[in-house]
Amino acid sequence: MKMQDKLNQIKELALVEIKEAKDSTTIDTIRVKYLGKKGELTTILRGMGSLSKEERPIVGKLANEVREVLEAELEAITKAVKEAEKQEKLKNEVIDISMPGKKQTIGKKHPLEQTLDEMKKIFVSMGFAIEDGPEVEKDYYNFEALNIPKNHPARSEQDTFYINDNVVLRTQTSPVQARVMEKQQPPIKMISPGKVFRSDAVDATHSPIFYQMEGLVIDKDITFADLKGTLELFAKKMFGDKVKTKFRPHHFPFTEPSAEMDATCFVCNGKGCKVCKGEGWIEILGCGMVHPQVLRNCGIDPEVYSGFAFGFGVDRMVMLKYGIDDIRLLYESDMRFLNQF
């Protein structure tokens, strides 16, 4: 069979196959079969070297004409098939306007953020400034400046995430207080809210990451009475005028004397329930008068100035306020839970 006859035969067969193609996959198969690197038309073009000088231009011209015809037909059928596939897809995906729509979820503040904002608002109204500091903290500010020496059990790797020997993930927001005292002379009146980190196993009451808010007041002639008055006022603003408070002796290395403040259970109003374990009282915070050594470490003369400090676990405040019995619920992003707040 002459080369011209082969080309005409390829053209006729290809046009028949193109006309019968119904989908994109079939069209691609035809394109490869005739025009691909190993296609029938390409094979003929590669064999032109065996033709005589007189035949080459004739066969070359015919081969190019066949290629142009096939490419044009393939392009036309491709457009037609794609449009048909598009219309079929639209037909199958038509929206039934009688069906109920999907409700859009509207974001809002997490209960932790809500409680933090409420606490900050109360303290700002009492004249406190809000201070911030690094979460990756120097060992000195997290421990030594706060009267926690190198052999203190709180510095154990079981309780603290160490980056290296001199850097930790802060275990409290107290380092912010130390940094402020170094840079600012009294009077100082500040709170430092933020995330802290402890090497705790996750359970219903413990999390390796949680929120704290700590406060500090330094000035001349500050007494424990000032501490009590400040925290009692906060409790009334936070939980209502009927709340009662009491202070119990405790120990913290950075305050002396130290105490814990309890408030009447705001679930049962002091009558006793499962939240307060039948006692009618709930532990709210730790507090005390700033230890003289802490003042010295931060460049403040304890013979001239005194002060008090306090600290809340914000997660605990949220749990107590809303009667939540598992801290993990605050971090699981379950909208069924979060939509209640």
UniProtKB/Swiss-Prot annotation:
Its EC number is 6.1.1.20. One of its GO terms (molecular function) is phenylalanine-tRNA ligase activity. Mg(2+) binds at E256. Its main location: cytoplasm. The keyword Ligase applies. It catalyses: tRNA(Phe) + L-phenylalanine + ATP = L-phenylalanyl-tRNA(Phe) + AMP + diphosphate + H(+). It is an enzyme of class 6 (ligase). It is found in: Cytoplasm. InterPro entries: aa-tRNA-synth_II, aa-tRNA-synth_II/BPL/LPL, Phe-tRNA-synth_IIc_asu, Phe-tRNA_ligase_II_N, Phe_tRNA_ligase_alpha1_bac, Phenylalanyl-tRNA_Synthase, tRNA-bd_arm. The keyword Ubl conjugation does not apply. Binds 2 magnesium ions per tetramer. Belongs to the class-II aminoacyl-tRNA synthetase family. Phe-tRNA synthetase alpha subunit type 1 subfamily. Tetramer of two alpha and two beta subunits. This is Phenylalanine--tRNA ligase alpha subunit. The lineage of its organism: Bacteria, Bacillati, Bacillota, Clostridia, Eubacteriales. The gene is pheS.
